[in-house]
From Swiss-Prot:
Subunit structure, interactors included: Interacts with Agrobacterium tumefaciens VirE2. Binds to VIP1. Forms a complex made of Agrobacterium VirE2, VIP1, VIP2 and single-stranded DNA (ssDNA).
Compartment annotation: Nucleus
Protein name (Swiss-Prot/TrEMBL): Probable NOT transcription complex subunit VIP2
Family membership noted in the UniProt record: Belongs to the CNOT2/3/5 family.
UniProt keyword annotation of Iron present: no
Any GO BP: regulation of DNA-templated transcription
Organism of this sequence: Arabidopsis thaliana (Mouse-ear cress)
Function: Transcriptional regulator required for Agrobacterium-mediated stable genetic transformation by T-DNA integration in host genome, but not for T-DNA transient expression.
Coiled coil: none
Phenotype of gene-disrupted mutants: Impaired stable genetic transformation by Agrobacterium T-DNA.
A GO CC term attached to the entry: nucleus
Length: 614
């Protein structure tokens, strides 16, 4: 099979990925064991895409010989009739061998070719990273099939490990290898997994292995375990061989199948988005998510489980009325213990440790404390010693903790979680006692603190709080007269001084003058009117003074800003001006000045203000 792999990995032709098309019915499968995933048209149902490109430019013209060996295993069933790829999106005469005619022959039980024969369908993608040659992988059912109807990798049998090659992977995964890199390398030199009828050997130190690219959705949408499996396949695992028990495969089945091995739905909101369908609340959403993980057989780390337990019991510890628990969404004791069992079973050699840096954490295990309810959690020991895998370096895992320490932590956690009701009652009692002690300590600056001061025997503090009884100081509170005449101060030793007798002059008793009116300005002299006009701008009195000045024959010049008074009749009177002798008031000297033959234009004379009659 490695020879076939090397001959199909050319680089001259780079054909883009397209829609898968199966070969004609003449490429039917040969005789062999029954396989429920082997379609009668020659399609191998399973993964949708293993690689996006098919390079066939440098394929050799013929295979080596009729008795060619596949990974040092002779296979008499390798036939060499003439033929070519006549269907699909490409045609090439460089490979004259019909790949579907590479029947098993005498190679039953040897290389990784399924018992139904090597059936290549569509535009298969044989990348340099899919090596299914040599070794044996027992542990997965013999009815395993090949890969999808678009791309197929010979020698890799897919049973329930990949969803029993059902449409759940085919429809929802789309193009597993078209984008990024879901897994890097899984290289093994003779990794032996007993129980697989379709043998799988990962080539040693080849830097290849199962290289599935693309950041796509696994198992019918964005399942929570998709990223876990990506992390499981995330790094290189160079091993020297060793048995991989059935429990390891079964744990992966539990992760990937999610209790629906034959479900063909493209979208399941309960599995794809568990937080949308879980109950509300700070602890409820996480509890619903853990419930979905428990249903899928997927565990959570111990640290996360402990955090969920604390959040579940103490949602809002700062509230004084908190009594613990949740009346709307109670979580029974059996459910908590069962969630914890799933968490602990995920952290040991029975399951793969879903860490961030990848790697199989196959350490020694122990039996579950509830074997009658979860018998699948028991596993065998010695997995890590046989495989020689490096431990997981993720902070969420406990690979760096020894076996004895892990057992002690688990037993300690079990002893604490056996009595959650007693713990809640003790917590409530502690809170009640703490609240009582807090209430008993009175604030010294409130009324209760003042009462404590009043009860003391210190007279100075009592006088500061209550004051002094003035009757003890000689103050007659029943007197009808003024008290200031007889009492000066409580802290003085001298008697109160007598009141001094004095008389107030009559001028201080003058009545308030009446307010000014328009009639009042008629009694004012010229000087007082001019003073009122210039000293009270923007005031009502200024308008009254100006009105009275107009009444007495004065007018205001807007350009010179002075008051003029006519002396006699004007000498010349025209339509726009007049000329004669005038007197005006100089505001600087506050005196009247005479001007003869002075011309005054009418447009420069201010009109008389119109005032309301008061």
């Amino acid at each position: 099979m490695s020879n076939l792999h090397s001959s199909l990995n050319g680089s001259a032709s780079n054909l883009p990925d397209g829609s898968g098309r199966s070969f004609t019915a003449s490429y039917s499968g040969q005789s062999g064991a029954p396989s429920p995933s082997f379609h009668h048209t020659g399609n191998l149902q399973g993964l949708h895409n293993i690689h996006g490109n098919y390079n066939v430019g440098n394929m050799q013209g013929t295979l080596t010989s009729r008795n060619s060996s596949m990974n040092s295993i002779p296979s008499a069933g390798v036939q060499q009739p003439n033929g070519s790829f006549s269907s699909g999106r490409f045609a090439s005469n460089n490979l004259p061998v019909n790949l579907s005619q590479l029947s098993h022959g005498s190679s039953h039980g040897h290389s990784g070719i399924p018992n139904r024969g090597l059936n290549v369908v569509g535009n298969p993608g044989f990348s340099s990273n899919a090596n299914g040659v040599g070794g044996s992988i027992p542990g997965i059912l013999s009815t395993s099939a090949g890969l999808s109807n678009r791309n197929s990798v010979p020698g890799m049998g897919i049973s329930q490990l990949l969803g029993n090659s059902g449409p759940r992977i085919t429809n929802s995964m789309g193009n597993m290898v078209g984008g990024g890199n879901l897994g890097r390398n899984i290289s093994s030199g003779g990794l032996s997994i007993p129980g697989l009828s379709s043998r799988l050997n990962l080539a040693a130190n080849s830097g290849s292995g199962l290289n599935v690219q693309g950041q796509n959705r696994m198992m019918g949408g964005v399942l929570p375990q998709g990223s876990q499996v990506m992390s499981m396949l995330g790094n290189s695992y160079h091993t020297g061989g060793g048995p991989l028990s059935q429990n390891h495969v079964q744990s992966v089945n539990n992760m990937m199948l999610s209790d629906h091995p034959n479900d063909s739905s493209l979208f399941d909101i309960n599995n794809d988005f568990p937080q949308l369908t879980s109950r509300p609340g700070s602890a409820g959403g996480t509890q619903g998510h853990l419930g979905s993980l428990r249903k899928q057989g997927l565990g959570v780390p111990l640290v996360q489980q402990n955090q969920e337990f604390s959040i579940q019991n103490e949602d809002f510890p700062a509230l004084p009325g908190y009594k613990g628990g949740n009346s709307e969404y109670p979580m029974d004791l059996h459910q908590k213990e069962q969630l914890h069992d799933n968490a602990m079973s995920m952290m040991h050699s029975q399951n793969f440790s879903m860490g961030r840096s990848g790697g199989f954490n196959l350490g020694a295990t122990y039996s579950s404390h509830r074997p009658q309810q979860q018998p699948q959690h028991t596993s065998s020991t010695g997995g890590l010693q046989g495989l020689g895998l490096r431990p997981l370096s993720s902070p969420n895992a406990v690979s760096s903790i020894g076996y004895d320490q892990l057992i002690q932590q688990y037993q300690q956690h079990q002893n604490q979680s056996q009595f959650p009701v007693q713990q809640m009652s003790s917590i409530n009692q502690f809170r009640d006692s703490e609240m009582k002690s807090t209430q008993s300590e009175a604030d010294p600056f409130c009324l209760l603190g003042l009462l404590d001061v009043l009860n003391r025997s210190n007279p100075e503090l009592t006088s500061l709080a209550l004051g002094i009884d003035l009757t003890t100081l000689g103050l007659d509170l029943n007197s009808t007269g003024n008290l200031y005449k007889t009492f000066a101060s409580p802290w003085t030793n001298e008697p109160a001084k007598s009141e001094v007798e004095f008389t107030v002059p009559n001028c201080y008793y003058a009545t308030e003058p009446p307010p000014l009116t328009r009639a009042s300005f008629k009694r004012f002299s010229y000087e007082l009117l001019f003073y009122t006009f210039y000293s009270m701008p923007k005031d009502e009195a200024q308008l009254y003074a100006a009105d009275e000045l107009y009444e007495r024959g004065w007018f205001y010049h807007k350009e010179l800003r002075v008051w003029f008074f006519r002396v006699g009749e004007p000498l010349v009177r025209a339509a726009t001006y007049e000329r004669g002798t005038y007197e005006y008031l100089d505001p600087n000297s506050f005196k009247t000045v005479r001007k003869e033959h002075f011309v005054i234009k009418y447009e420069l004379m201010e009109k008389r203000p119109s005032l309301l009659q008061l």
